């Protein structure tokens, strides 16, 4: 059983769009936001093409006042938010010692502070209603380190712990807060890394990912829809404070022995 209103941050395309589309098929009313009007318009057109009615809003989720105003507007125009998916995120691939503190803070602001701000805005109404679902989009980098992504890994590790803490503080109000940790997902942003090279070979990073993934492929955005629907439904009412890794098995796999 799916609740009525589902708000997804950053759901105009990619992973957020796939998750929201899956929830719409399960019966949710979709409310999404993005930082620019052009992205909201693009998202609305994509939902319409898919036969999904969606409500789109412009909002900078790092701005607490703007988020509070938007949540009040959504509650007035659509209704109380039953399900929140915190999907907005950025990454800066810069070696740590070359990254400025301002660049580090920018990643933390979007990937960690924003989920805190948005969750804080919707939880009071969930408490009043007596139930709620919060899904934070974490990452394999909530568990692993990798060169050039120190800010992203720090933020996603923090988001994992924020997920657990929301569970700890608000579980008694029938609010379930869980996370989804995607593996390497085939999106427009990763397309250049998956293109066949002029000599017919695979891109080195593509080879690396396929070798490291027991499923031997990149994930698809649609692979995340089912787990999100589960975590948003009554089927997960006793699941709280967990991160479900949808990674094709990377975190379980040490890799093959060199020949």
Which residue stretches match the model-derived regions?
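Conserved glycine-rich cofactor-binding loop
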Residues: 10-14
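Short, small/polar-rich loop/turn modules that mediate ligand/substrate recognition or access, typified
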Residues: 85, 171, 176, 239-241
